[in-house]
Regions:
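Hydrophobic faces of well-ordered beta-strands that scaffold small-molecule active sites
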Residues: 1-3, 33-35, 62-64, 84-88, ...
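Glycine-rich, proline-tolerant flexible connector loops at the mouths of alpha/beta enzymes
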Residues: 2-15
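Alpha-helix-loop-beta-strand connector modules within alpha/beta enzyme cores
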Residues: 14-35, 145, 150
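Surface-exposed amphipathic alpha-helices with a cationic face
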Residues: 21-27, 77-78, 117-121, 141-145, ...
């Protein structure tokens, strides 16, 4: 379950998000809650964002932006209840503007992957965001990080290919992927949204499992 916090905060519905997360924890305790916040700030501010994600909302993990450096990631990793999912090679069309810039002989997203795997992971639970819309880069990141979990958005409305995601992103155990489809499920059919969402979610799951 991956709620995007901005959609709740924009209309003053943070309490509703608290209630939804509490419902998930109580009734579906095996389902992880990932707070999609993409936070990126330093020191004490990052500690407060970690407190918000893990103590207020009870999330198991939160998406974070590494642009300001590793000290902005650590507060999430050392929090007793938390894990950080670091933006690496994101699914949006403009992601290459910075993420593909060469630093030495490698693009920036590879540097982020190496730092996450070899440095930040020493301090706690860390994983990476790598978009389904860039399957070749997904394979490159997997080669760098080993069996680390990857959050993979972009299957569904953004056009990511499930077969390519599994082929390029699965780890040595043929797992290690948290594949995210949002709009394709949420807006599957306005006439019967609940049934349509269930059908699309199951179809997406079954398609991914087909290629494992």
């Amino acid at each position: 379950f991956k709620p995007q916090i901005a959609y709740f905060a924009a209309i003053g519905a943070e309490k509703q998000l608290e209630n939804i997360c509490a419902h998930i924890r109580s009734n579906y305790p095996t389902i992880p809650i990932i707070l999609d916040a993409k936070r990126g700030d330093i020191g004490d501010t990052a500690k407060m964002y970690a407190q918000e994600a893990f103590d207020r909302y009870g999330a198991h993990a939160v998406t974070v932006n590494p642009y300001m450096g590793g000290d902005t990631i650590e507060p999430y990793l050392v929090h007793k209840n938390g894990a950080a999912i670091v933006l690496c090679r994101t699914s949006n069309a403009g992601s290459g503007e910075f993420q593909s810039q060469m630093i030495g002989d490698e693009p920036l997203y590879k540097h982020v992957a190496r730092r996450a795997a070899h440095e930040w992971a020493k301090h706690g639970d860390v994983s990476l965001v790598v978009g389904a819309t860039y399957p070749e880069e997904l394979a490159e990141v997997r080669a760098i990080v080993g069996d680390m979990p990857l959050l993979v958005p972009g299957v569904g409305a953004q056009g990511g290919d499930p077969e390519a995601v599994v082929k390029n992103g699965a780890n040595s155990q043929r797992t290690g992927l948290i594949v995210n489809s949002s709009r394709a499920i949420l807006y599957a059919d306005t006439s019967d949204p609940m049934s349509a969402a269930v059908a699309v979610a199951r179809k997406t799951r079954d398609t991914l499992n087909l290629y494992r």
